[in-house]
Amino acid sequence: MCSHDPLHFVVIPFMAQGHMIPLVDISRLLSQRQGVTVCIITTTQNVAKIKTSLSFSSLFATINIVEVKFLSQQTGLPEGCESLDMLASMGDMVKFFDAANSLEEQVEKAMEEMVQPRPSCIIGDMSLPFTSRLAKKFKIPKLIFHGFSCFSLMSIQVVRESGILKMIESNDEYFDLPGLPDKVEFTKPQVSVLQPVEGNMKESTAKIIEADNDSYGVIVNTFEELEVDYAREYRKARAGKVWCVGPVSLCNRLGLDKAKRGDKASIGQDQCLQWLDSQETGSVLYVCLGSLCNLPLAQLKELGLGLEASNKPFIWVIREWGKYGDLANWMQQSGFEERIKDRGLVIKGWAPQVFILSHASIGGFLTHCGWNSTLEGITAGVPLLTWPLFAEQFLNEKLVVQILKAGLKIGVEKLMKYGKEEEIGAMVSRECVRKAVDELMGDSEEAEERRRKVTELSDLANKALEKGGSSDSNITLLIQDIMEQSQNQF
């Protein structure tokens, strides 16, 4: 590669909102740099979403988007089901994983046609292990993107290398995770993410772990000041090839960028802003349990009744399909919507989360502890009320509540298992919800300390991506590293 040739990052996101959105933001951050070209490869429906989210950005013309066809019907999925969030049942997750990874041949062909400039590096989602094979074929480095924090990634690494899960028999027993800077305790299911498993996900998980180990480096949506010890330790564990470049949501500086980020919002920006402006500063609880929330209907009703009992203004985001249609019917038929209409805003579908969290009226965030939401809440300076569901979310809760002291636990201890949600039923009563909301939004010494701490972290987050900040500098170091790799090829 000649020194004057632009670097060409090929970004291949997994088709799920929680994976797609941060990788589009990372693409925007890279494309701002001189001498860097970025191409995103994704499926037809997701191309349309990305173009919409980028259409109001000055960077729209600098990011190339290549379309590939999602082979849903060949794997037994409904036609047009091109995002994990669209699955009617998470029992179809294996089918979706297989369909996503069947894109390898199309992606390879698209990369072969990239001549000026040819690809310099792949940024591949962890759920697309074929990206490691393509990196080897094209003899270029591959950076893996998990969408996790350094704390979670280091914890997963420790669990994998220590073999501690083999020594733990009970699923309910809490045990210390060895070799971490802080003393933290978990149950076996809470730390089983990205570990070898039995059952229908065995082969898929094995491929993901192998591709993770094969990757040249890791790109992480976090900032070093948030988790200093864990960023350092994880970088050591990955031979120095870890770049913390977040919070990537901060590339959406303008209100319109924030409102258009992600899927098409189910509420207009003006309507949302009007409601937020009508509330007192720091008075509103924002409630969103993620695009893959699988709580049973009984639990969702208890949550709603707890929010009502708290007498605090709130925004509650719920999904549109399946049991959430039943929830919407219950809200109307039970009189819930009528009773809370003066202080509650229910958004059915996608919400402009970064836009909402950045408003001065928001004083708390009830979250499932997905890393995007967790980091967006911290970046906005909003204390968190944590309700983890699955995946690495219990790890994120531990970071937020115990280590950062920026949040409060609602008290969930067991994972929600797909297909068995109704068996588990309601684990958190309306009274527990009410008490937790009152404590988070109250004026106790502990509540004030959480606000002080998260405000401090928010200031650090915003500085990280400023010129010369830690994440800004890490983007520079990443580009320099890939440039050296490209020049060493020839």
Swiss-Prot record:
* Keyword Protein transport assigned: no
Q: Which domain of life is it from?
A: Eukaryota
Enzyme class, top EC level, equals: transferase
Q: Does the keyword Acyltransferase apply?
A: no
Give the enzyme's EC designation: 2.4.1.-
Give the keywords, sorted: Glycosyltransferase, Transferase
User: PROSITE patterns recorded for this chain?
Assistant: UDPGT (PS00375)
A biological process (GO) of this protein is: phenylpropanoid metabolic process
**Gene3D superfamilies attached here?**
Glycogen Phosphorylase B
Where on this chain does UDP-alpha-D-glucose bind? 291, 351-353, 368-376, 390-393
User: Which Gene Ontology molecular function entries are recorded, alphabetically?
Assistant: UDP-glucosyltransferase activity
Q: Which family does it belong to?
A: Belongs to the UDP-glycosyltransferase family.
What is the protein name stated in its UniProt record? UDP-glycosyltransferase 73C7
UniProt source species: Arabidopsis thaliana (Mouse-ear cress)
Q: Which gene encodes it?
A: UGT73C7
